[in-house]
Structure formats: structure tokens, C-alpha cells
Regions:
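Short, polar/acidic, helix-capping and beta-turn segments at strand->helix junctions
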Residues: 1-118
Length: 118
């Protein structure tokens, strides 16, 4: 299991709270970037390929958000939809989408991903 922030080219894609600073659409993009970063780690550990991925077991998507914001599942869909596009049925997974007051480095999204390998 890995905890992933939305880094691209060494920088966070977006920082701040959803939706006052970061739009839902940008937060979805950040969730997708977290997944891509996680899959890069998996591929690096598996000889540069994802062929050993049996299935995606679980995602935990944490959203730094304003009080009263209740659309965390919509943000998490950015990550879930990407995994299903990549892996098909094996990309279906259990998921938690949780709102929080703050995340490390002021990230707007953080993803925890559990992958089962062959």
C-alpha cells in the first residue's frame, strides 16, 4: 500500500482546499495524477510493466476541503474511472472518499492505493 500525492515533474499539480481554491475538476485531475504516480511505482517494482497487476483492491481518497463540502466521491471518481479505463474489470475496487481539513504539503488530494499482484 502506498500513499500518493499529485506530483508531476517534481511539483504538486495543485494546492489548497476544494472547492474554494481548487475546483472539483482540478481535484479530479490531481486524483488521476496520484494514480499514475502509484502505477509508476508498481511498474518500477515489477520490471517496468504492469502485466503483473491482478487487480486493484482498494483506494482511499483524501480530499482537503472546505467545511460543508460533501462531494468527495466526485473527486475520487477521477482516480476510480482512470483505473477502470486502464484495467477494465480488474480496475474495479473498494473505495473510501474522505474529506479532511488539511493534507501534507498543502496538497488538495492524497490517494492510498492497494494493488494485488499475480
Amino acid at each position: 500500500m502506498r500513499i500518493l500525492e499529485p506530483f508531476r515533474e517534481g511539483k504538486l499539480v495543485a494546492t489548497g482546499k476544494v472547492p474554494s481554491v481548487v475546483s472539483i475538476e482540478m481535484a479530479q485531475e490531481c486524483a488521476r495524477q496520484c494514480v499514475l504516480n502509484g502505477l509508476a511505482v508498481v511498474a518500477a517494482e515489477c520490471g517496468g510493466t504492469l502485466t503483473q497487476v491482478s487487480r486493484i483492491v482498494r483506494l482511499g481518497v483524501f480530499v482537503a476541503c472546505d467545511d460543508g463540502f460533501s462531494e468527495q466521491p466526485k473527486v475520487a471518481n477521477g482516480a476510480s474511472d482512470l483505473l477502470q479505463q486502464i484495467f477494465g474489470e480488474a480496475g474495479r475496487h473498494a473505495r473510501a472518499a474522505i474529506g479532511t481539513n488539511a493534507l501534507p504539503l498543502n496538497a488538495c488530494v492524497e490517494v492510498e492505493m492497494m494493488v494485488e499482484l499475480l
